[in-house]
Regions:
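Beta-rich nucleic-acid/ligand-interaction surfaces
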Residues: 1-9, 55-62
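Acidic/histidine-rich catalytic neighborhood
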Residues: 2-31, 35, 71-72
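Acidic, glycine-enriched catalytic cores built around paired aspartates
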Residues: 23, 28, 39-266
Length: 266
């Protein structure tokens, strides 16, 4: 499989997913972070559909690949910040932990906050997200198109609320309340545990997160009215083009599975 590194940048700002030394005070970073959380939660089915391939039907959930359940890993530092925002604001500074390797002549090293067990399909790794469910034989163009589109929708909705607010103090108050509401509504998508365990399958069901291991069932997300409206609104693909993509991917899956079955019988 592939690990697709994704982030956004802007002239004069650099990477918008760079938390800086005080991420709890970085409004741009927190806004994009929450927008991404919102997007992935609302469109987890589309992200899953974007990597629906015959090879992934065997790979996901095993072979050091993430499970078919889409979730987000943030790491301890961001988990703490998100929890504080949900409670009404960052009341204390959140600092990155360090490692003392026991050698006086060497400096303390920052503890890596990224996910190393590889069981999270969508993980924050320092200054970017990694989408880890794309198949090895698959182009990453369509998964990244889906991710860009769903985050664009999320940012569009956030900006629609914030842009009319011209007073600076009221703007920050509105932003803080908006981020708090986003976290409260979409925190179910956040998961830092073992994605391979049976307990996660049960927990995901309790959270009402989609668990779609089958390719055909996953591709059905492309045919929903929600998906057609999303891609048409942002002029990515038309409903007809989206339907064609569903038909083509379904046909490819059937052919690949048939070839595998016929080869096994030789």
């Amino acid at each position: 499989g592939k690990h697709n590194n994704w982030s956004l940048s802007a002239p004069g700002y650099g990477s918008l997913l760079n938390p800086g030394s005080s991420p709890q005070e970085n409004a741009i970073f927190l806004t994009l972070l929450c927008a991404t959380i919102k997007a992935v939660d609302e469109h987890a089915d589309l992200l899953r559909a974007s990597v629906a391939k015959s090879g992934n039907e065997h790979r996901l959930g095993a072979h050091e690949a993430p499970p078919a359940i889409i979730s987000i890993f943030l790491g301890d530092l961001l988990d703490e910040i998100i929890e504080q925002i949900e409670k009404g604001g960052t009341k204390k500074a959140c600092t990155q932990k360090t490692i003392n390797i026991g050698v006086d002549t060497l400096p303390m090293f920052p503890l890596d906050a990224s996910d190393r067990n590889r069981t999270s399909p969508f993980a924050f790794t320092g200054n970017k997200f990694e989408f880890r469910a794309v198949g090895s034989s698959q182009t990453c163009a369509w998964p990244m198109t889906v991710l860009n589109t769903i985050v664009a929708e999320s940012l569009d909705e956030i900006c629609t609320i914030l842009e009319p607010v011209k007073d600076k103090p009221r703007f920050h108050a509105t932003l803080n309340k908006l981020l708090q509401n986003i976290i409260k509504k979409h925190k179910r998508i956040l998961f830092s545990g073992d994605g391979y365990g049976e307990a996660w399958i049960e927990e995901a069901e309790r959270r009402k997160l989609p668990n779609v291991p089958g390719t055909i069932e996953a591709l059905a997300a492309l045919e929903t009215p929600k998906a057609k409206a999303l891609f048409e609104k942002y002029k990515v693909v038309s409903p007809v083009e989206l339907h064609a993509r569903h038909e083509i991917q379904t046909e490819i899956f059937h052919k690949e599975i048939s070839i595998e079955a016929e080869t096994a019988l030789l």
